[in-house]
Amino acid sequence: MAVTLAKEALDVGIITNNGEKMLAFYRDVLGLAQEPSIPFPGLGTIHRLVCGNSILRIVAADNAIEQVAGGAFASRNGIRYLTINISNLDEVVADCKAF
């Protein structure tokens, strides 16, 4: 049986040691609207950002997450990239450079 989608979008979670900087980038530079944050005891704070019909969840960890050495694109499983299709690339690149 195939799944019946309840939402025509993907929600993505990113766990980070650098929550404030990452939140500032997606919220202040890319302009994603922020929904109320959710504290998750023992894990960190989940910051929710609206991206079209999708939600980007930035999990700012309470305790430092071990840094794993890099590898080739397909060398391990997990989220390796996130694509946001936009139509104003030049303006966004200028904002990123200013950030």
Where are these regions (language model features)?
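Core-facing hydrophobic residues within beta-strands of well-ordered domains
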Residues: 7-9, 79
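Active-site/binding-pocket entry motifs
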Residues: 55, 62-65
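A detector for short, charged/polar N-terminal pre-domain segments
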Residues: 1-4, 71
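Conserved beta-strand segments that form the floor/walls of ligand-binding pockets within enzyme
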Residues: 11, 57, 85
